[in-house]
């Protein structure tokens, strides 16, 4: 736990000791899980890529309200945000059974009362829960145009979409112009940062400006197979 504590202090991330303990337990569960939900094999790399990478661009925020983590998979970023922002109600959404089993196990083990796990496709969930969330987030799920279509309908007007991307996001942003216009979303800010490992990252902060048309998201699979261009 000392390494986790030291790394977050070095990045300037504020925390309570209980959050360090829960995060350490989560990382151990992930690295030892039989479900093979991560390519990371060491605690060091997991601390940087699954914890610090998520918290650095939000270290001056006090997120509260409701957040939808689309394609939560191994719990990044949703579980980390649930641990470090206790006033945030987080929905961990994934359609894969092994991911859902792992997430439910960790939520129970850590007694995370502000996190809930849902097994469903994002296209269906966003259609059924229109404008219910203050935030939606995702990492390593899809390109930006697809993310906007499957996430924006679930976010209230004035709410934010927080997408974690690598440094070469400009091409995705150009591709996503139609999706942004159609779904009534605009880019508000790009937060660039560099991990101590030397890897460059960015958080795209987008804002929903108006109600997304009822025809979005399209039926399951279409936003991935035929993204808005």
Swiss-Prot record:
Keywords: Cytoplasm, Methyltransferase, rRNA processing, S-adenosyl-L-methionine, Transferase
The family this protein is said to belong to: Belongs to the methyltransferase superfamily. RNA methyltransferase RsmG family.
Pfam family, one: GidB
Keyword Mitochondrion applies: no
InterPro entries per record: rRNA_ssu_MeTfrase_G, SAM-dependent_MTases_sf
Cellular component terms (Gene Ontology): cytosol
GO molecular function: rRNA (guanine-N7-)-methyltransferase activity
High-level lineage: Bacteria, Thermotogati, Thermotogota, Thermotogae, Thermotogales
Subcellular location: Cytoplasm
Function: Specifically methylates the N7 position of a guanine in 16S rRNA.
CDD domains per the UniProt record, alphabetical: AdoMet_MTases
Annotated positions binding S-adenosyl-L-methionine: 71, 122-123, 139
EC number: 2.1.1.-
Record bears the keyword Cytoplasm: yes
Identification of the protein by name: Ribosomal RNA small subunit methyltransferase G
């Amino acid at each position: 736990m000392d390494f986790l504590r030291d790394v977050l202090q070095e990045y300037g991330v504020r925390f309570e000791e209980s959050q360090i303990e829960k995060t350490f337990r989560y990382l151990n569960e992930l690295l030892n899980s039989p479900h093979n939900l991560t390519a990371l094999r060491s605690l060091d790399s997991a601390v940087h890529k699954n914890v610090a990478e998520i918290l650095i661009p939000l270290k001056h925020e006090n997120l509260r309200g409701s957040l939808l983590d689309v394609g939560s998979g191994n719990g990044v970023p949703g579980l980390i945000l649930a641990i470090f922002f206790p006033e945030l109600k987080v929905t961990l959404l994934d359609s894969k059974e092994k991911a859902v089993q792992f997430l439910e196990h960790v939520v129970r083990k850590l007694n995370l009362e502000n996190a809930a796990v849902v097994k469903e496709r994002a296209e269906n969930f966003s259609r059924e829960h229109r404008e219910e969330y203050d935030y939606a987030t995702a990492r390593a799920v899809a390109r930006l145009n697809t993310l906007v279509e499957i996430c924006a309908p679930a976010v209230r007007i004035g709410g934010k979409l927080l997408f974690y991307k690598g440094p070469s996001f400009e091409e995705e942003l150009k591709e996503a112009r139609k999706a942004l216009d159609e779904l009534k979303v605009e880019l508000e800010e790009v937060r660039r940062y560099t991990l101590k490992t030397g890897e460059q990252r960015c958080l795209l902060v987008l804002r929903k400006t108006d109600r997304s048309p009822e025809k979005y998201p399209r039926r399951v699979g279409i936003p991935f197979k035929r993204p808005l261009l």
